[in-house]
């Protein structure tokens, strides 16, 4: 049963890929959706047996690589962390498959699309179930490849091509860091198996001094692993690919942002918690990076006009919350927020897809407005998702986001306070852009064309069913799972993840945190909603004043241009590497030294020599006699010296040189 959870999506993808031409769009959609749905049902059974029954399951299938000290096998690990991720991935993926049946019904390449969705799901399941770093890396690279194929699905669009290449290249930076971290684990522990590495993590580690700094082997490995998470989970510095990934179909965006790809980095940190717990330096770095990411993405999203990009930046901001929750050693709360976030983020993306699908692929919110009457169901769904996103009391997001902020405050460290205040301010911006999205899309006077309004319609039944199910999850999952997953004294995470006793602060955040810290997120959410209402619906004079102010214009450009991260990366990194690649690698090395000293240079030298020799052929007898004399003289001299030279000159080399010279001379004459 456990193996079927992983391999059923692979079966559906294989059938869609090899027989999609014969099954057609409907047959392929039914096959892939059925396989992923069965996998989702089996995930619920596994959740009952493993998480609720507190019995982890280890499956060792077959040996994979065995070379001296290196031994890797095909194995699967099903513990509490794994089964939670299985439910998230398979449930969201099955709803996205069902949604795509209607959304992609008019696309002639829908069988290929369903094939890509299923293989994406398979690689994510392979990532979360692997019991060693090598298998995790296989799934890690697989989801990167599948995301490239899905973002690049409409390959005739230039922006989709550029976005897919950008996602692939930016993620290669993080993948390189993850690979170095895995190499470091093997060097230090002589294995890539999770259980062995985690059991030995507390043993004495190697330390050395570099640039007057004391470095620890575990710290270095954790930093390298975190670089992998920075790339995959779109943290500050490597986050630029995430908004551009919106060029793919909307179901792809929902799957990437809710259940797969971006959650892989958070999962990897939670899985490697026994390593990170013994590296306080790495935890501090993770906390600062996550807090800065949440603030950066929240401030960037407030002035975006693309419907999907606003939701994409909200994903980036929420990933920052998950990351700095891991940095303060509360991996269970981070995974809980990941699960809650999957429901309302998939709901937001699929609701946005319903609007875009009905509005003839229009994504600019400024060209919408007044759609609440035409899309009552979609408006209600997006309202529920937005309220859950901002942490409205008693909705799903409220039970995880507020706990993360309380934990950051009760950490009583510089990094914890930094994360608390940046996270709290990010709540204000999150509330602002969430309600701005609702106002500009559904409530302001209409700005769309009349012909678009005549054709628009609410979500059809196949698209409405996933929205309703996700809305129920956005309303009740946090309340139902809170006590089980992050309640005091719960045994849910008995086998994974691991937290040192000195880092346990959940009880302190529950009872020792001041009341004001519990009210700050609610106050900021209310303030953000009120500000969005006043700016976008009421105060036209505020907008005019904002447009005429030089400072406000510069601030608008700064946030709208995404803190100029793309420009900085292009000017200082991309163009520098392009210049280096052309002037040094191409001109100086490839077309320079390698060609001159390589085969081209040797052939050119012999060819020029043969041309000079051929000029001696003048047709005069005395010239030939003189040439014979010049040729015989060194020959006679050389034959006399042969006995002394034969000890260090190879006669075979001399023969080869003589014959090659003759052939080159003959070819030059022809």
Curated annotation (Swiss-Prot):
One biological process term in Gene Ontology: ATP synthesis coupled electron transport
Superkingdom: Eukaryota
GO function terms (MF aspect): NADH dehydrogenase (ubiquinone) activity
Disulfide pairs? none
Q: Which InterPro entries match?
A: NADHpl_OxRdtase_5_subgr (IPR018393), ND/Mrp_TM (IPR001750), NU5C-like (IPR003945), Proton_antipo_N (IPR001516)
Provide the reaction this enzyme catalyses: a ubiquinone + NADH + 5 H(+)(in) = a ubiquinol + NAD(+) + 4 H(+)(out)
Extract one GO cellular component term from the record. plastid
- Look at the named UniProt entry and state the broad enzyme category this protein falls under: translocase
The record's principal subcellular location, in a coarse class, is: mitochondrion
Which of UniProt's keywords are assigned here?
Electron transport, Membrane, Mitochondrion, Mitochondrion inner membrane, NAD, Respiratory chain, Translocase, Transmembrane, Transmembrane helix, Transport, Ubiquinone
Q: Does the keyword Phosphoprotein apply?
A: no
Question: Where located?
Answer: Mitochondrion inner membrane
Its membrane topology is listed as:
Multi-pass membrane protein
Q: Transmembrane ranges?
A: 3-23, 36-56, 76-96, 113-133, 136-156, 178-198, 218-238, 250-270, 283-303, 319-339, 340-360, 375-395, 425-445, 461-481, 618-638
Q: Which family does it belong to?
A: Belongs to the complex I subunit 5 family.
The record, for PANTHER family, names:
NADH-UBIQUINONE OXIDOREDUCTASE CHAIN 5 (PTHR42829:SF2)
Q: What is this protein called?
A: NADH-ubiquinone oxidoreductase chain 5
- To which species is this protein native? Triticum aestivum (Wheat)
Gene name of the record: ND5
């Amino acid at each position: 049963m456990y193996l079927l959870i992983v391999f059923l999506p692979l079966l559906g993808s294989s059938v869609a890929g090899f027989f999609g031409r014969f099954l057609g769009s409907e047959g392929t959609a039914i096959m892939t959706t059925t396989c992923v749905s069965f996998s989702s049902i089996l995930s619920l059974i596994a959740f009952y047996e493993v998480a609720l029954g507190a019995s982890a399951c280890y499956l060792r299938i077959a040996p994979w690589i065995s070379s001296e000290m290196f031994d890797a096998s095909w194995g699967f690990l099903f513990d509490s962390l794994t089964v939670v991720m299985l439910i998230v991935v398979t449930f969201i993926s099955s709803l996205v498959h069902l949604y795509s049946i209607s959304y992609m019904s008019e696309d002639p390449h829908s069988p290929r699309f369903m094939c890509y969705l299923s293989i994406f799901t398979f690689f994510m399941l392979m990532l979360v179930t692997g019991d060693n770093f090598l298998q995790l890396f296989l799934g890690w690279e697989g989801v990167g490849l599948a995301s490239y194929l899905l973002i690049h699905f409409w390959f005739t669009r230039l922006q989709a091509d550029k976005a897919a290449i950008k996602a692939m290249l930016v993620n290669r930076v993080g993948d390189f860091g993850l690979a170095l971290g895995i190499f470091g684990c093997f060097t230090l522990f002589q294995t890539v198996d999770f259980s062995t590495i985690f059991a030995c993590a507390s043993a004495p580690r190697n330390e050395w001094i570099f640039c007057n700094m004391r470095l620890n082997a575990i710290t270095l490995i954790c930093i390298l692993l975190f670089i992998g998470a920075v790339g995959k989970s779109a943290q500050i510095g490597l986050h630029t690919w995430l908004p551009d990934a919106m060029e793919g179909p909307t179901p792809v965006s929902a799957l990437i942002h809710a259940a797969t790809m971006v959650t892989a980095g958070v999962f990897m940190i939670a899985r490697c918690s026994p390593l990170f717990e013994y590296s306080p330096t790495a935890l501090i770095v993770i906390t600062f990076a996550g807090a800065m990411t949440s603030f950066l993405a929240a401030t960037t999203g407030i002035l975006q006009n693309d419907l999907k990009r606003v939701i994409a930046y909200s994903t980036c901001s929420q990933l920052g919350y998950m990351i700095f929750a891991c940095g303060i050693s509360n991996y269970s709360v981070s995974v809980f927020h990941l699960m809650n976030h999957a429901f309302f983020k998939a709901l937001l993306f699929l609701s946005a897809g319903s609007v875009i699908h009905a509005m003839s692929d229009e994504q600019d919110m400024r060209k919408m407005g007044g759609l609440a009457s035409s899309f009552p169901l979609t408006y209600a769904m997006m309202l529920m998702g937005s309220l859950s996103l901002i942490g409205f009391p008693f909705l799903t997001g409220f039970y995880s986001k507020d706990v993360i902020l309380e934990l950051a405050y009760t950490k009583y460290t510089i990094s914890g306070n930094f994360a608390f205040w940046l996270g709290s301010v990010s709540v204000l911006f999150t509330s602002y852009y969430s309600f701005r999205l609702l106002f500009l899309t559904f409530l302001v006077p209409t700005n769309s064309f009349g012909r678009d309004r005549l054709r628009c319609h609410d979500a059809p039944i196949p698209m409405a069913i996933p929205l309703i199910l996700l809305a129920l999850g956005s309303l009740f999952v946090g309340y139902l799972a809170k006590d089980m997953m992050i309640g005091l004294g719960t045994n849910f995470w008995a086998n994974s993840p691991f937290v040192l006793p000195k880092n346990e602060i959940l009880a302190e955040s529950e009872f020792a945190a001041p009341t004001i810290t519990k009210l700050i997120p609610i106050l900021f959410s209310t303030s953000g909603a009120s500000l969005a209402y006043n700016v976008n619906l009421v105060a036209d004079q505020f907008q005019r004043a904002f447009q005429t102010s030089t400072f406000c214009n510069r601030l608008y450009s700064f946030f709208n241009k995404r803190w100029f991260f793309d420009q900085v990366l292009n000017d200082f990194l991309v163009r520098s590497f392009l210049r280096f690649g052309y002037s040094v690698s191409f001109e100086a090395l490839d077309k320079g030294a390698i060609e001159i000293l390589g085969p081209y240079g040797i052939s050119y030298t012999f060819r020029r020599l043969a041309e000079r020799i051929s000029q001696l052929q003048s047709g005069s007898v005395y010239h030939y006699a003189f040439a014979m004399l010049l040729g015989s003289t060194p020959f006679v001299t050389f034959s006399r010296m042969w006995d002394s030279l034969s000890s260090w000159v190879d006669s075979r080399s001399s023969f080869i040189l003589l014959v090659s010279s003759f052939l080159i001379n003959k070819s030059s004459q022809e």
